[in-house]
Design a protein with these regions (language model features):
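Single conserved hydrophobic/aromatic residue that forms the stacking wall/gate
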Residues: 140-149
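Core of folded catalytic or high-affinity ligand/protein-binding domains
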Residues: 1-126, 134
Length: 149
């Protein structure tokens, strides 16, 4: 499916990109997860899909993990909170039930080339993207060369 936020010089704001990402989830029959009242973890994860131009295929999710680890500013404690969400635990449980842990190992092995390309690209970044971004950052164009962070 064509996603405008994956274009090189996309004119969308981050907020518009996230809306397009949620529409994409609906189009492929998946429900967009919603944050709890006092959390923004899911919103911030969805934003990384838009910022780094990734969809939700298993390979792209594996690549997004690498973008996040090497291309974002974050705190491990905060990221562990994402892994503890019931929806994410259920997703991992379903994946390992269908293919076992071997499926995840094969997936990451298959994606090693992609992961190395991402690591090289993150080394050329002048600023890491803040995983916990301020709300006003969602109004800035994704391709803006000088981001105020």
């Amino acid at each position: 499916m064509y996603l405008r936020y994956q274009e090189q010089d996309c004119g969308l704001t981050l907020r518009e990109g996230i809306a397009e990402y949620h529409a994409y989830l609906g189009a492929i029959g998946r429900k967009a997860m919603v944050d709890h009242a006092d959390s923004r973890l899911i919103l911030e994860h969805d934003a990384t899909h838009v910022i780094f131009g990734m969809d939700t295929s298993l390979e792209q999710e594996a690549g997004l993990d690498t973008w996040l680890i090497f291309g974002c500013q974050y705190q491990w404690r905060y990221l562990r909170g994402y892994a503890q969400l019931p929806e994410i635990k259920a997703l991992y449980k379903a994946l390992t039930k269908d293919g076992g842990w071997l499926l995840l190992i094969k997936l990451y092995w298959k994606c090693l080339g992609l992961k190395w390309r991402i690591i090289r690209r993150t080394r050329r970044m002048t600023h890491k993207w803040p995983f916990q971004f301020p709300e006003e950052l969602s109004l800035i164009h994704i391709s803006e060369p000088t981001r105020p962070y």
